[in-house]
A protein has these predicted regions:
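Hydrophobic, aromatic-enriched alpha-helical segments typical of multi-pass transmembrane helices
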Residues: 2-255
Length: 255
């Protein structure tokens, strides 16, 4: 009779290759943490600017604003938001690295949706187009030129808060929802972080251009977004710390 020997069961421990791969992600985690803190700064600065200097309501008022203060004109046309959106792209990539072992397909989907939202939003922003049109309007010498530039400015403003903006905004909310769902199953990020991500993503499903409701929800969403960025930054910096790859790999093995 043949006796079958069975090896005693042991807890799974992270291998050398897994630790090496995790160490390779450290610069990305650090970059994502810095990006999250920059996003916090963007929100803190952008909200007072919006409240103190609301965007003009007509093309001529926009041109006047750019003539008086070009920087304020760019800020009212979401220049800071462009920076924040660019930082979001870096955060998506860092979060993919941190959560890829929990659900790789879902994190890939969330990251792709997030990066598409960044791309679409950049395509919709017309801040520098308006700056150029304003300069041309100031230099125009005939009424025909001014009328043409006013029409071009109107078309540019329509693009700024048109379909591309709405799609980019909503896709950003969808990406956050997907990533937050994966976070709920992770031992790396806290459950409060995941729940705040779910709340922020849900509030972003209605774009800011959707009347008063959209505007109010967009402003309300900034509060949980601010907290989420702070929590994300803290965790990403922890993952980037020396020897953190061991604890991270063990936490994933236990998930």
């Amino acid at each position: 009779m043949t006796t079958v020997l069975q090896e005693p069961s042991v807890a799974r421990t992270p291998g050398t290759e897994e630790l090496r791969i995790e160490a390779d992600w450290k610069p990305i985690y650090r970059m994502g943490g810095v990006a999250a803190l920059i996003s916090v700064a963007v929100i803190v600065v952008a909200v007072p600017i919006y409240l103190i200097s609301p965007p003009p309501t007509s093309v001529l008022d926009w041109f006047t604003l750019f003539h008086r203060n070009a920087l304020l004109g760019l800020l009212d046309l979401d220049l800071l938001m462009l920076i924040g959106i660019a930082m979001s792209g870096l955060i998506y990539i860092a979060l993919y690295g941190a959560l890829r072992q929990i659900n790789r397909p879902l994190m890939a989907l969330g990251t792709i949706v997030g990066l598409v939202s960044v791309t679409v939003y950049f395509a919709s922003n017309t801040a520098f187009n308006m700056l150029s049109l304003s300069s041309q309007y100031d230099a125009a010498t005939t009424e025909a030129e001014r009328s043409r530039l006013l029409a071009a400015g109107q078309a540019t403003l329509a693009i700024w808060q048109g379909s591309a903006y709405d799609i980019g905004y909503v896709l950003g909310g969808v990406a956050m929802l997907i990533i937050a769902v994966v976070m709920l199953r992770s031992a790396v990020f806290s459950r409060p972080t995941a729940y705040i991500g779910l709340l922020t993503g849900a509030l972003m499903l209605i774009p800011a251009t959707a009347g008063t409701v959209g505007l109010v929800l967009s402003l309300v969403s900034l509060a949980p977004a601010l907290i989420w960025d702070i929590l994300i930054a803290r965790t990403l910096f922890q993952l980037a710390a020396p020897r953190a790859e061991v604890a991270t790999a063990e936490a994933r093995a236990a998930s």
